[in-house]
């Protein structure tokens, strides 16, 4: 029992024992409601004597013979016996009886009107436990009526933090079993079960001769579905459609959109879907009728199956309810089940981009080819990469195999087979090496005259389309100025030669034993590259990405301090692609490489006092998923001593076989080298032992030779951050009390990338009248446990008549920017005494 009630009882008991005359007071607590409380009761002028059913004779003897002077409260935690069985009846004739009407005490203490006291009396058993009673008090119900009392009792049983029937239903459905539900058993124990089902009818329109949670759940999901599916529902479902669809939609929306409860929603949805066999039902409907519905995952399964069929049929003009295929994919990925289906829709969107270019025709001339590649064709490589990136994350790929085969065929036999011969015809032109900047001129073009400290990140095998994704990522940062350009790599396009070309040099050469020298210095390792770099700029250094990525701030500054140029060698893509057992992970490596570089740039710009960055690569790559056949391989045998790779052969004499072209190393390196590099005109490879075969580089193609040059200038002291956001946890759509408490959650813990924010939270009418107090909250919690980021706000509403036809909103404003962050509509239903007609 709440402490204030107990104080009332103690005050009344103390009043019984005033005066000089000895007094005996009998208190028969029929239901032992106060038995727990008696341990804490101390009377000012009396002692407490505990009467037992079997010690009446001794009690009579004690009170009338042993201690005849002390005042006693004789407390009996059981009903008073009949006169014939009560051996203390004569003692009671000269004593007094004390009656503690718990229902009356509770009503007075809580401010419940007399006419609602019978509701308390009916459920008085609930208040026999102090913890339960305190939970009822903690709900802070302001205006009591029959419904509020019953909802409060149900809320307290469920340990809800707010007096809300929607919250009660949420807890019952998500925290309990559908059969043998522990909460329903507790409701029945306190005579609240019938009230629960009547409230379900009032709020959700659910009624049944034998109500059950299973059928309630089906009613909720079928009614919700009926509002968003444009087709007629199956006959067997129609009996479950409720007339209270608005309340049901608001309730299920709150579940599915809550970061805390969305997984519970998914489980309930899957349960109902299985029972109703919804996939079969939806499979018989037009896909146009399903676009707006996200009640069940089965909707997406039906849509995905249809989309795969359209793409395999190369029906890129298909329209679904006004949406093109990529528009539909984007829309569905943003809906509730997008967390589970988003990758599938991304895959389908990428496949669409590939299928759209199935009839690919290359242009002639190197400059037009490069211009077109930079403007559009790079996207074919990017979408192919994205397709497999998401494909590899699918739990089951069987149903996507026909689409995968189509994508693979388009990429290999339509795109690469057409583009690469045109490229290799163009690169033989006399002016080919003057169309775009050359990799061997990188230092002079980008670093020779720089005055500010610059970090150069060389990401091994970052081809142009991956660089374009990095560019797009950095462009999203408002404090970053980003530029993307391109340069033509050396040929053969492999690591040792590409890394050397990126260093400053007067001469670049390949020896007869195929060593690569810059200004006569062997530079196939970090020490050699640093020697070359420091010969041009003593205030420079070469470091490995893995050696600096986890350095503490002080250690990082030690690396950067007094340096003007820092070459950082990053090897994520090539490290995975160049090994036969990991080459199929190369597209994952591309994603990781972009993220690692973004993180490093942000970290150095904030902690390393360095704000100028250039990102480039030694070479690109070609990757095809299907295993190579013998027809994809070229013998490529050279009579001379040769440096052979799957995509190139360097030897004294050029190879003259069909499908092979060649170029002098002197032309590539800008010297008199007479050695020849031979390479496949197509995406085919030479027959060479060792290594993988699907991931290759070293040859002549846009994918291998067009490498990105990205320049980023960061604003000082800036790290890409976002504000810590807040969201509503409590499922509250109707305000029924002038004082209402709600639970919110800070969505993310404050960190290096999530900064604290201050919010103003209050309620508004549609006329912008503020109808509640305004709460301020500073979202600055660093707790990783989401439950510990939940906080409670108390709102006091204006005591006025609210128009049920008007819109009212809970609104959240960012205090710093003054911008509204979000709003949620609520119904104002402040119940006054004369308005009630609940009828239990």
Give each language-model segment a name:
Residues 1-454, 463-613, 617-840:
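…; additionally, a secondary subgroup of soluble metalloenzymes is captured
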Residues 457:
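Beta1/beta-strand and adjacent pyrophosphate-binding region of the FAD-binding site
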